[in-house]
Design a protein with these regions (language model features):
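Hydrophobic residues in alpha-helical segments
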Residues: 14, 40-43
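Residues that recognize and position ribonucleotide moieties
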Residues: 3-4, 52, 85
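Arg/Lys-rich, positively charged N-terminal/basic patches that mediate binding to nucleic acids
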Residues: 1-36
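Generic alpha-helix structural propensity
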Residues: 31-34, 40, 51-54
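Enriched for short, Lys/Arg-rich terminal
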Residues: 66-98
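A short, surface-exposed loop/turn module that caps and links secondary-structure elements
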Residues: 43-67
Length: 98
């Protein structure tokens, strides 16, 4: 699957564990990179729902059209589907603390 990034910092963090660790902290940065590996290895968006460990789920309200997958604890990787073979990484956040 092709991945687009909402920001250059998110793109840089996807290339380097050092960058990911500086941006998110090491445990979250490591999971971020692992999730990108899964996304790149997946052919179609709908296949992501078969990966139970991702806990991919749609968001509601102002985030309608966006999806979240678990990184660690309350931290989620927020994505949106662009096409069946293309996603955009929007953010990594603890949206439960809002």
């Amino acid at each position: 699957m092709h991945i687009e990034f909402a920001t250059n910092r998110l793109a840089d963090a996807g290339i380097s564990l050092v960058e990911a660790g500086q941006l998110f902290g090491v445990p979250i940065g490591r999971k971020y990179i692992q999730r990108l590996v899964v996304l790149r290895a997946t052919d179609k968006y709908t296949q992501l729902f078969g990966h139970r460990a991702l806990r991919l789920h749609p968001l509601k309200g102002k985030r309608t059209g966006q999806y979240a997958m678990t990184l660690t604890g309350n931290y989620r990787l927020i994505i949106e589907k662009i096409q069946e073979d293309r996603v955009r990484i929007l953010d990594v956040e603890d949206y439960h603390s809002d």
